[in-house]
Amino acid sequence: MLKKRFFLSLALKNKLLYKIYLYYNLYIRNFKYIFQKSYSQFNDDIFIKKFFKNKAAGTYVDIGCHHPFKLNNTYLLYKKGWNGLNIDLMKINIDLFNIWRPGDKNICSAVSNKNKISSVYIPNNNILSTEISIQKSYANTIKKHHKNSFIKKKILISTFENIIKNYKVDLEKFDFLKIDIEGEDYKVLKNINLKKYKPTLICIEDGIEKKENIK
């Protein structure tokens, strides 16, 4: 583990090593995940694909996309011929998407219900963790249950609409919405104009925090 983190820390400072690491991540480290019937953690994508079985082409929005195929809810749709928008606050994840899923629009940004400068909490200085969050209470809960320590870093956080505007994303409506952003899920969902975008299916993480009511 320490050797992997040491190499990654070097790769982040060298363009050639960084590119090598990206391809290592896709074709060696996670090769076993490429050829699967389901890419989701709990076979969510099988249900999603069946739900849209009569729709050959469509559009998805994946907020907190993490990886282009490993534990991913939209890769089956991408293989089917769909495309869409993937958003993640970690640049390395978006670079992986740009290599593996060039047919998508991939954006590096943190998302919440307000435009602001805030802190991101990264467990054990591990930039590949799925438990990175902008919510201190979420980080504290993870720390309590998994004994992880966190580093704190200031970043720019944007609303979904602000991202669409700033990156000039051509998105009038979409069919499928997935949100998994470690504690901010319901805030972001409530901030998206669902009447405008009209998704027919929404997948959101049932987090460890008490959920807000969605109306």
What name fits each language-model region?
Residues 2-215:
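Phosphate/nucleotide-binding beta-alpha loop and adjacent structural elements of enzyme active sites
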